[in-house]
Amino acid sequence: ALTCSDVSNKISPCLSYLKQGGEVPADCCAGVKGLND
């Protein structure tokens, strides 16, 4: 089961991408993939 802190830690690298666009950071991609584990 995921906790809220797990989710926020894993998606935090995505926030700047979501705000500004551009390339998806590798940390974001890895974090999102990690949510499925």
Curated annotation (Swiss-Prot):
SUPFAM superfamilies assigned to the protein according to its UniProt record, in alphabetical order: Bifunctional inhibitor/lipid-transfer protein/seed storage 2S albumin (SSF47699)
Transmembrane parts of this sequence: none
GO annotation terms (biological process): lipid transport
Keywords: Allergen, Lipid-binding, Transport
One matching Pfam family: Tryp_alpha_amyl
Single GO MF annotation: lipid binding
Gene3D superfamilies: Plant lipid-transfer and hydrophobic proteins
Family: Belongs to the plant LTP family.
Function noted in UniProt: Plant non-specific lipid-transfer proteins transfer phospholipids as well as galactolipids across membranes. May play a role in wax or cutin deposition in the cell walls of expanding epidermal cells and certain secretory tissues.
Protein name (record): Non-specific lipid-transfer protein
Organism for this UniProt entry: Artemisia vulgaris (Mugwort)
Lineage: Eukaryota, Viridiplantae, Streptophyta, Embryophyta, Tracheophyta
